[in-house]
Amino acid sequence: DNSYKVSGGLHGVSVSVVNALSSKLHLMISRAGQVHEQEYQHGDPQYPLRVIGETDKSGTTVRFWPSELTFTQTIFNVEILARRLRELSFLNAGVRIVLRDERINLEHVYDYEGGLSEFVKYINEGKTHLNEIFHFTADTDSGIGVEVALQWNESYQENVRCFTNNIPQKDGGSHLAGFRAALTRGLNQYLENENILKKEKVNVTGDDAREGLTAIISVKVPDPKFSSQTKEKLVSSEVKPAVEQAMNKEFSAYLLENPQAAKSIAGKIIDAARARDAARKAREMTRRKSALDIAGLPGKLADCQEKDPALSELYLVEGDSAGGSAKQGRNRKMQAILPLKGKILNVERARFDKMISSQEVGTLITALGCGIGREEYNPDKLRYHKII
């Protein structure tokens, strides 16, 4: 009975749906010393459940053949299966999962004793980390199980994944809200206690604290509630305080017991806060420059006469020399030319403040006309519908 206290409610529905959409489904169940068998065709049982032997094992084997009457394509994508089974192995430490693709004689074995710690390690592979992985499990008074693993790295992106009873929530929910609240509170408390905020003269936000963070949040909830049938957001209100309380206790202790890691994390947060402030100033400067330019357009841009974006084209060319040739050969009515330096900046590896302070990037932003930042960016304002 304990096996189903924190189920996701998907297993019963799924086997019913698979059965209905299969030309054949075969069940073999080993239980209580006996092996039981039943077979279905297009959802209809071919005979009652029957005993076919004895065993000292327990478990269920399900084999199914997708119906070609229903599906036009019945090819299984092994990469999708591998990704999900690997994920399940991380979420259930010590569970061994074997995936065999007999079409190409391929076998994957997933067995992660470290659970979520190994999940974070897998995601952060190849990245420079700032602290050893922080990992804890807790059973709360409300009957909710909480497990969290996290680590900061030198990247600038936040990567937090949430799960409820092994089901992923790409839109987060109450477990993510509790985690973020506890994380921000714990880090702010540490920064204040160490007098870092006054010393560095910066204001820190939750976004600053989560820059470069990789985290996995897994909760086990007896009766979870989701925002939709696809279970992409957890809305159980009792989960937030459970996660927040457990995370607050464990993470605060971690920062106190690991001063070197705490110092590295604090340094990362201060850098992120400064970069955010620098980006804000650069953004304002870009806006002011745009307002002062004639018609708000960069000087190097040779604009076209056409005002309808759907009929306008922008050609990005490398260097003034190529720009001159392009301007001579263009159709002035519909083709605009913007000369830029080659290899201006790898924006995937650069912080936002560095990106926005680049003259070439600023010129490009102004020419396109969409604006920058979460609050201002509007693709409907794009001045050219064809960019080459």
From Swiss-Prot:
Domain of life of the source: Bacteria
Similarity annotation: Belongs to the type II topoisomerase GyrB family.
Organism: Acinetobacter calcoaceticus
Entry keyword set: ATP-binding, Cytoplasm, DNA-binding, Isomerase, Nucleotide-binding, Topoisomerase
Residues carrying the site annotation Interaction with DNA: 343, 346
Misc remark: Few gyrases are as efficient as E.coli at forming negative supercoils. Not all organisms have 2 type II topoisomerases; in organisms with a single type II topoisomerase this enzyme also has to decatenate newly replicated chromosomes.
Protein name per the record: DNA gyrase subunit B
SMART domains: TOP2c (SM00433)
Protein's gene: gyrB
Protein function: A type II topoisomerase that negatively supercoils closed circular double-stranded (ds) DNA in an ATP-dependent manner to modulate DNA topology and maintain chromosomes in an underwound state. Negative supercoiling favors strand separation, and DNA replication, transcription, recombination and repair, all of which involve strand separation. Also able to catalyze the interconversion of other topological isomers of dsDNA rings, including catenanes and knotted rings. Type II topoisomerases break and join 2 DNA strands simultaneously in an ATP-dependent manner.
GO cellular component: cytoplasm
GO annotation (BP), single: DNA topological change
Lineage per the UniProt record: Bacteria, Pseudomonadati, Pseudomonadota, Gammaproteobacteria, Moraxellales
Listed transmembrane segments: none
Gene Ontology molecular function terms on file: ATP binding; DNA binding; DNA topoisomerase type II (double strand cut, ATP-hydrolyzing) activity
